[in-house]
A protein has these predicted regions:
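Elongated, amphipathic alpha-helical interaction scaffolds
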Residues: 1-207
């Protein structure tokens, strides 16, 4: 009986995981995640982001949004499979465009034997490496685009329910007054959302 319960529980978790992955790609849901937690989206309305996800094109006929292959397999360095991997070009108030790469992960098990944020560092590095030869090369590293991993924990412990943490690169001025350009080092960010319902995605870090 215990074995039956274990199998039933595992099947239930797998079913939830698959359904959550399908939900993530819905423009209304993904749009709210981007608007709520991506810094580069602060100048763009939710309605416009949803239109970009739905397939809006620029004057040259290029899509602003792409759902990308969620598998990155680097020779001799293993394979990773993201839950939902995409990139989107976000218009800025100054007339420029910022492209970001985004992986949204549904993490049903809060503690799988390691810290999900540590796994996220691996994901971020692979997302950056996958841009080599496309966004940047050895002659122009400045073409590198910012990467995000957003973790959603729908079965977080009650004591963490509603908590949101952001982990990113910070500059520490040890000596002197030289300040490096933010664009030079602000290339990766993780956001951990511990929420027992998806309503958190309507929140915003830009308030």
């Amino acid at each position: 009986m215990d074995k039956v319960l274990e199998i039933t529980s595992n099947d239930h978790i797998i079913m939830i995981n698959k359904l959550c992955k399908r939900i993530l790609g819905h423009p209304e849901i993904l749009g709210r995640i981007i608007k709520g937690f991506i810094k580069e989206a602060k100048d763009v309305s939710l309605e416009e982001i949803i239109e970009l996800i739905k397939g809006k094109k620029d004057q040259e006929g290029n899509s602003y949004f792409q759902q990308l292959n969620n598998v990155i397999d680097i020779a001799h360095h293993g394979r990773v499979e993201f839950d939902y991997f995409c990139c989107i070009n976000l218009p800025q108030d100054d007339g420029t465009m910022k492209r970001i790469y985004l992986d949204v992960e549904i993490q049903n098990v809060e503690n799988p034997g390691y810290a999900p944020l540590t796994r996220g560092n691996d994901y971020l590095s692979r997302m950056i490496t996958s841009q080599n030869g496309k966004e940047y090369d050895y002659r122009n590293y400045d073409g590198m685009k910012k990467t995000y991993v957003i973790w959603i924990l729908p079965q977080a412990a009650k004591k963490r329910d509603g908590h949101v943490n952001c982990i990113n690169s910070k500059l520490e001025n040890i000596s002197g007054s030289t300040i490096e350009r933010l664009e030079s080092y602000d290339k990766s960010e993780q956001i951990m959302i511990s929420k027992r319902s998806m309503r958190v995605v309507i929140g915003s870090r830009h308030r």
